[in-house]
């Protein structure tokens, strides 16, 4: 028999039960519940376009996930991250072991295969454990039982040849849906687009914004000081709340790119500043730490509670307002306004690898329209001569450059207040010809890609002239 799997032949035969092959009663196999949950959640992401964060919330997530113990929850998160970061590469490897396509309605089977392959290709899970649990999973599910032999053969073939096959596939496959790759290429050109998609395959580091002495904290935590003053850690191996400085409120978690928009407001000590769509509060903390009188506005009570807890830990204060920005009338104007608008979040792919699979071009158009409405509302809160910074974590110009250009075309009472690359450390190479901020996961490259990059962000600084 050839190395490729004869699909029809595998359908008609089932392997005999042998210890360790996954043919034992499914309920007796440790780890099977976690793999079932991973396959179920993978289906929810790629088939139903359900955001992963909600599915894996420890308190309110998918019941199959929340029923697991903390260790298995962490495993499920790791499996899903690997399966989504490398979705098309895994799919290509699976296809290479089949002599014909799987049936059109074999979604559950594919999810089982992807979950197993992600473990032995990209995680520190023994080949035999991943394969045996996948076989047990397939044999216990009536929808996939007849494919048990195929699952066993495909996965064992992949595991045997992974050292040779995986590098070739990774070098020739873009692990992103076509619509996303095409929009990146149109916006940034093929070279930068490929660099962004390559960065998506690597887990993002842990970035911290510190209140004082970033160099000292970088040394104390075993991290690196980034050009903008962010302290960066790679795989710290310690839960965030247990890291030095957390309990004392010395720092907060914030991607390096996310820390830039608040700084674009300039010196805010003693100024009245509105932070709109403020939760969970990283930018509010920056502004308060810089001496601003901050009004933090958000429409979500749950997110504002989290913001309040974060500020309390940091020993910072702000006026916290729950309101719909479209109808909020504070009765006064602000010296400066920061609007970090809800968006497609395509710039956060390293942290949220589901985004490219749960969003679509239609979603981007709808979100851009919603952001324009928020920008119109925010503009009415700025005093004459005051600054307005509009930002989001999208890589798409429809939500950034083109949106701001349209706003300025229709609003003669506002003008662009161009950002200078020399305003503060870390901006070099991140400011475009119009004076807007644009970051991508391909920025700040270093030899070890684990230390490279940042979230994709856009920010424009505007000034009210009338």
Task: Annotate each predicted stretch with a short phrase.
Residues 1-466:
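S-adenosylmethionine
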